[in-house]
Amino acid sequence: MTRYDAVEAASYRVAREISLTGLSSWRDAVAPYFRPGSTVLDLGAGTGLFVRAFAEWFPDVTVVAVEPSAAMRSASGLPMLAGHAEAIPLPDASVDVVWMSTVVHHVRDLTAAGAELRRVLRPGGVVVLRSLFRERHSGIGLFRFFPEAARALSSFPTVAEVADGLGFAVDRLEAVPQVTASSLAEKASSVRWEADTLLRSLSPDEFSAGRARLLAAAAVETGPVVDHLDLLVLITVGGV
């Protein structure tokens, strides 16, 4: 999994974190899996956006955060374990849900990660992903201003590649809306080249041109920025 340095971690927190109000559709989407008394592993927890969200949304759920980057763990200010998808520092059969938000495209060995997921999941447990997939990106407004960023999609897996690579079956797939920013002006103020896999594929000139397009649109357009990421729920093959 990708590791971030201290500068990137700080930029990530500025550029990528979204208000809990903006994520309310995600609360509703995952609620069926976050049952009272369950244990959730936030795998690749970053700077802790969803650790905080789950604590507020589901106070009867225990969340364990694992993050490979020391800089991200430090920036979060939260208790987190060092680890990654291919080496999860938890006992066998210890969690009911594995949550992975914008993480799976960073996983280098899906087969090894799948074995680890099955190891730590209890019987009947699920893997819940919030992600962008190569063939499902029309709901991301970033491409309107930074069209060249689409070339980075070649490094993102498809839904089938994720399910097959991890060795799980698809139980649910749907696009979930989120208010990424209250306005294009807010989005423009927080966009960071170093904080986004898609933007990191751009040259300095491409990034500058895209930011100029974003600023020009922000000067005349009002209203919230709404993007759609996919909810993918995976179950063990045969549902065991």
What kind of region is each of these model predictions?
Residues 1-35, 49-53, 57, 72, 126-154, ...:
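Conserved class I S-adenosyl-L-methionine
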Residues 19, 47, 172-240:
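Conserved Class I S-adenosyl-L-methionine
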Residues 41-43, 47-87:
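Class I SAM-dependent methyltransferase SAM/SAH-binding core
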Residues 99:
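A conserved beta-strand element that flanks and buttresses the S-adenosyl-L-methionine
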Residues 102-106:
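Short catalytic micro-motifs in class I SAM-dependent methyltransferases
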Residues 111-123:
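A short glycine-rich, Lys/Arg-flanked "PGG" loop and its adjoining helix->strand segment in the class I
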Residues 153-167:
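Short alpha-helix
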